[in-house]
């Protein structure tokens, strides 16, 4: 019996050792595969470094987290749609728009075209709308005047207050026979008890949630959110900018406490680029393709004769994350007179800090305007840690009383 017991113990130890070596081998292989993928595919060196450290410290756990959260599958789906449906021609047959620009602006225009893959289009009208008191009435009026289609995308769409008015107005448009499609990011809709998703569905409106992580197949996209704010009416009248459909932007009884952000009312050929962006987001959410008949029907839409050059530049989970950074740094480098940035959250990376400092050193007046009291104190503390890096080169930083405003402005002439 003692020999049998000893043999059994030896067998168990060997089995345990074999299992341990198997787990170790799997962890090593997973770590090598994860590290290789991160090095090859991560564009941001800081992101790649963080993932490498995570895999080195916790091989299996780090690899599993990378598999779930480190691979951008939304990008792959969008690329498949772009390959199947190449960019459509704009609303009119337009030639090159940047021919008569000064050299430094022509260079910026070429940069924008290269990184965005979209044409710089003439003939647009862009009307700035400051705050909800200006933007929301114009948006609601456009919805009331819709004859054929409404496409609305918002990261936050509250169902109370101003959001309830939007829901009612959209429902009235649908009752008139207007085709209405609404896209809301799933994250806020799931975290908030006041989202508009349920109310929109009760009115029979076609509404989709972007990238719901509760679906097992989309668990990997928990961190991939859609922050776009788009309203496109009848295919030719658009609104876009920084405002969600959110109560903090609408405080008629206490306007001084309202978030002050910028929205644009846009008409002209560039609305076609806004349409393509919504089409891709809608396809990613519902796998439904929107054709030209959805936007304008048989009658088509008018093309305005505005005087603004415009280009739609996308930034989101299905796009290259460096795109807006390249445009932003290119605009700072093209500035000749003044750069003014108004932002609630000033957390620049090192290339942006270098561009701002270089602009100030070559004589451009650089102003950063931030809120005196941020709605996110921790972000404000982190922001202040960067101030010295640009102040020492002559950049001016002003703290004002507003709560929330995003408005970069570049003066070149």
Predicted regions and their residues:
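Structured cytosolic domains appended to multi-pass membrane proteins
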Residues: 352, 358-359, 374-375, 379, ...
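C-terminal structural cap/anchor segments
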Residues: 378-405, 412
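Helical hairpin unit composed of two closely spaced alpha helices linked by a short loop
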Residues: 345-364
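Structured, soluble regulatory/oligomerization domains located on the cytosolic or IMS-facing side
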Residues: 150, 336-339, 365
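N-terminal localization/anchoring segments of enzymes in phospholipid and broader phosphate metabolism
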Residues: 5-326, 330, 334, 358, ...
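Short, contiguous acidic/charged loop-to-helix segments that flank catalytic cores in large enzymes
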Residues: 319, 344-347, 373-381, 397, ...
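Single conserved hydrophobic/aromatic residue that forms the stacking wall/gate
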Residues: 1-11, 404-413
């Amino acid at each position: 019996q003692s020999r049998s017991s000893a043999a059994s113990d030896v067998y168990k130890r060997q089995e345990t050792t074999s299992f341990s070596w198997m787990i170790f081998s799997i962890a090593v292989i997973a770590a090598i595969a994860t590290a290789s993928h991160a090095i090859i595919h991560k564009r941001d060196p800081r992101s790649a470094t963080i993932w490498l450290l995570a895999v080195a410290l916790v091989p299996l756990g780090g690899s599993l987290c990378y598999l779930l959260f480190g691979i951008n599958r939304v990008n792959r789906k969008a690329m498949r749609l772009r390959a199947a449906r190449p960019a459509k021609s704009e609303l009119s047959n337009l030639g090159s728009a940047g021919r008569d620009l000064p050299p430094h602006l022509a260079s910026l225009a070429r940069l924008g075209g290269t990184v965005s893959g979209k044409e710089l289009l003439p003939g647009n009208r862009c009307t700035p709308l400051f705050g909800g008191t200006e933007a929301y009435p114009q948006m609601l009026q456009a919805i009331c005047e819709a004859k054929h289609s409404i496409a609305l995308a918002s990261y936050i769409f509250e169902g109370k207050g101003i959001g309830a008015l939007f829901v009612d107005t959209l429902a009235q448009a649908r009752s008139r026979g207007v085709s209405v499609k609404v896209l809301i990011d799933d994250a806020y809709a799931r975290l908030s008890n006041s989202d508009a998703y349920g109310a929109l569905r009760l009115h029979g409106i076609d509404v989709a949630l972007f990238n719901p992580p509760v679906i097992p197949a989309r668990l990997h996209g928990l961190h991939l959110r859609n922050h776009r704010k788009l309203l496109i009416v009848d295919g030719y009248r658009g609104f876009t900018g920084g405002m969600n459909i959110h109560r903090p932007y609408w405080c008629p009884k206490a306007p001084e406490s309202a978030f002050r952000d910028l929205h644009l009312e846009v008409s002209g050929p560039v609305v076609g680029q806004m349409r393509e962006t919504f089409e891709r987001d809608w396809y990613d959410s519902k796998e439904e393709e929107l054709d030209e008949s959805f936007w304008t029907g048989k009658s088509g839409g008018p093309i305005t004769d505005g005087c603004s050059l415009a280009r739609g530049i996308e930034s989101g989970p299905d796009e290259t994350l460096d795109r807006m950074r390249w445009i932003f740094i290119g605009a700072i480098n093209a500035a000749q007179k003044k750069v003014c940035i108004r932002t609630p959250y000033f957390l620049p990376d090192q290339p942006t800090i270098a561009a701002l400092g270089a602009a100030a050193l070559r004589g451009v007046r650089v102003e950063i305007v931030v809120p005196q009291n941020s709605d996110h104190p921790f972000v404000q503390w982190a922001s202040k840690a960067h101030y010295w890096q640009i102040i020492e080169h002559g950049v001016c930083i002003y703290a004002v009383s507003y709560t929330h405003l995003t408005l970069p402005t570049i003066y070149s002439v």
